[in-house]
Amino acid sequence: MTLLNPYFGKFGGMYVPQILMPALYQLEKNFVDAKKDSNFQKSFFNYLKNYAGRPTPLTLCNNLTNGTKTRIYLKREDLLHGGAHKTNQVLGQAMLAVKMKKKEIIAETGAGQHGVAAAIASALFNLKCKIYMGYKDIKRQSPNVFRMKLMGAEVVSVESGSGTLKDACNEALRDWSRNYQKSHYMIGTAAGPHPYPTIVKEFQKMIGEEAKKQILEQENRLPDAIIACVGGGSNAIGIFSDFIDEDVNLIGVEPAGQGIETGKHGAPLNHGRTGIYFGMKSHLMQSQEGQIEKSWSISAGLDFPSVGPEHSWLNSIHRAKYVSITDIEALEAFQILSKKEGIIPALESSHALAYALKLMYLDPKKEQVFIVNLSGRGDKDIFTVREILKKTEKKHESL
């Protein structure tokens, strides 16, 4: 029996081989104990403050909104050590791994940000680290691959399937099922079998707690909307968490990729079906026969065919709204923020920003306050963007 509820409504659960159940029960017990342990909590927040660099600022974008009555604030997770929100929860999971006397970390990564974060935490806590990454993502994210290796991680190229995050998740789970007695599987998002979605939310909820305190200090009121990109959904659930019971619109932005109508997207909440995948019941992209379909996004971190179960639940009860943004729209937002504010966002975060800009342009005279979770910085994406812009320039020249 579990100690915590493994479901969010009808979503979630523990759909894994029987061999992994003892590992999940052990993880849940240690997590429950850690929540009650004041020394664990004190140590965790000490690492967040003095190692990771929390709290992160809430930045008002004056240039971006000039000429409108909209005020857009960025929650600056890009300024966290490691370059993204991922660092928050890996510190917590690494501490749990040490508490459970594990010697090795197994992780999966898409954009490489979770891989970098896992390598950071493993180095800090003197743990071996093995990271599974799709071969396509290795090509797309070479700077992050080098960072991981520099910090002592072994990066395993996954050649099977579509060679992206979905396949890396599958290989990491296979490894863990063989080695769970000595290894901890450090999931990078608020997805997977219970207790992972609950653990990741707990170790990311300070994003929302800080943002609420900061917006009240700056605006003396809560925002009209919180906007965050959604792949697996950890940055979104982290910032949503402290606003779920408030009168604030929660907007998750999925990748529309090349356009929903093309089928090349990663938007399972609005264009998928409920199914079992990655140890959980949630929304996922499926064929008529029930096979997992390939997801698509310019952003490796959103290139995932499913989503965390709490997002499926929030969607089903209409507490959060989920929309989608295309590659082209995200790329435009990436360039606009870089030029207007001198902040280069991750392509993942650019999806959330693009939707905020869409709302702003829709009614520029409306007084409204948005918080966009800038979940990561765009250093990792500059080579991808450069190549796309080069191709675009060549097309224009040939016209």
Swiss-Prot record:
Catalytically driven reaction(s): (1S,2R)-1-C-(indol-3-yl)glycerol 3-phosphate + L-serine = D-glyceraldehyde 3-phosphate + L-tryptophan + H2O
Assembly and interaction partners: Tetramer of two alpha and two beta chains.
Listed CDD domains: Trp-synth_B
Intrachain S-S bonds: none
Keyword terms, alphabetized: Amino-acid biosynthesis, Aromatic amino acid biosynthesis, Lyase, Pyridoxal phosphate, Tryptophan biosynthesis
Pfam families in the cross-refs: PALP
PANTHER family for this protein: TRYPTOPHAN SYNTHASE (PTHR48077:SF3), TRYPTOPHAN SYNTHASE-RELATED (PTHR48077)
Annotated GO CC locations: cytoplasm
Annotated gene: trpB
Database matches in SUPFAM superfamilies: Tryptophan synthase beta subunit-like PLP-dependent enzymes
EC identifiers of the protein: 4.2.1.20
Protein name from the UniProt record: Tryptophan synthase beta chain
Organism of derivation: Buchnera aphidicola subsp. Schizaphis graminum (strain Sg)
Keyword check for NADP: no
UniProt keyword Amino-acid biosynthesis, yes or no: yes
Function: The beta subunit is responsible for the synthesis of L-tryptophan from indole and L-serine.
Cofactor(s) needed by this chain: pyridoxal 5'-phosphate
Pathway(s) served: Amino-acid biosynthesis; L-tryptophan biosynthesis; L-tryptophan from chorismate: step 5/5
